[in-house]
Amino acid sequence: MPKFIEGKLDAKGLRFGIVVGRFNSFISERLLEGALDALIRHGADDKNIDVARVPGAFEIPLATKKMAATGRYDAIICLGAVIRGATPHFDYVAAEVSKGVAHVSLDSGVPVAFGVLTTDTIEQAVERAGTKAGNKGFDSAVTAIETANLFKGIK
């Protein structure tokens, strides 16, 4: 019979970094509230949570890389909102942020949860920041907890 390794949803004793973009703060602050709520509900001590605020989504990967390099965090949660406008700027930012965050996780071995919304409209972002479609900040924190525990089981 194979051995199954799964992460549990218990944040006790784990240390988390959160990187949140300030641009579109009316959305990103709701995502941050959701992430903090999930971490605390699942047993994290608020003294084991560090929040780094960066100007916008484009700065998220580099701040995440700096946090990962410290070796202090069991997982890092990236939060922000990139909303499509009338120019191709959205496409460049959304693609580079997602690639950059993925590279940090792969290169560092630290679990990184991607909670950066990439939406076509403000309404879609609002729906995903605590209204009709739930709170993706909360969901990202749950992913971070589970993955951090999974990695502890693999060691």
Swiss-Prot record:
GO biological process: riboflavin biosynthetic process
Top-rank EC class of the record's enzyme: transferase
This protein's record includes keyword Nucleus: no
InterPro entries cross-referenced by the UniProt entry: LS (IPR034964), LS/RS (IPR002180), LS/RS_sf (IPR036467)
Residues binding 5-amino-6-(D-ribitylamino)uracil, per UniProt: 23, 57-59, 81-83, 114
Keyword Protein transport annotated: no
Molecular function, one GO term: 6,7-dimethyl-8-ribityllumazine synthase activity
Catalytic activity annotation: (2S)-2-hydroxy-3-oxobutyl phosphate + 5-amino-6-(D-ribitylamino)uracil = 6,7-dimethyl-8-(1-D-ribityl)lumazine + phosphate + 2 H2O + H(+)
Homology family: Belongs to the DMRL synthase family.
Function: Catalyzes the formation of 6,7-dimethyl-8-ribityllumazine by condensation of 5-amino-6-(D-ribitylamino)uracil with 3,4-dihydroxy-2-butanone 4-phosphate. This is the penultimate step in the biosynthesis of riboflavin.
PANTHER family in alphabetical order: 6,7-DIMETHYL-8-RIBITYLLUMAZINE SYNTHASE, 6,7-DIMETHYL-8-RIBITYLLUMAZINE SYNTHASE DMRL SYNTHASE LUMAZINE SYNTHASE
Protein name per the record: 6,7-dimethyl-8-ribityllumazine synthase
Organism expressing this protein natively: Geotalea uraniireducens (strain Rf4) (Geobacter uraniireducens)
